[in-house]
Amino acid sequence: EIRLSLVGSEMCIRDSMEHLQVEAVPDIYVSENGYKVILQGRGLGAIIGRRGETLDAIQQLTNYAVNHGQSKRVRIHIDAEGYRAKREESLQRLAVKVAGKVVKYRKNMTLEPMNAYERHVIHAALQDYPNVTTYSTGVEPNRRTVVAYAPGQK
């Protein structure tokens, strides 16, 4: 079953690359809860897309294709050019910058719409930030994180 998942994920990813007309080679590694796929090649910006939306879509489709009809779920994590780590660092910097402004001006700030994972990164980055709290508002796909002034909050 695991071998079938591996073959299925590689086929799905290669089909996506062909459809996007991008030459990329998937390097697949076994991780603790599934597979990690690192895409290697040139011009991977088309695979990443705006704020990682295309990469997220490829990952979601691959997970669906591999797990459809299977009794045991396997998680496929896909990255290209280290995008996911770079995005996480960028979100953490944004969170701290916004929190500083919120405390300085004592006024809440609402961030741009983000997916659930990106909102989680913001919440986690600020969980111990003094005088600030975070919460999400709105409905997908326009759900946003609010960084709120909360005096005395730790």
What is each stretch, according to the model?
Residues E10, R14-E18, V22-V25, A46:
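Internal active-site segments that recognize and position negatively charged phosphoryl groups
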Residues R3, G34-Y35, Q40-R42, R50-E53, ...:
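Intrinsic disorder
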Residues V22-V37:
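Short edge beta-strands and adjacent turn/loop segments
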Residues E1-G8, C12:
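Single conserved hydrophobic/aromatic residue that forms the stacking wall/gate
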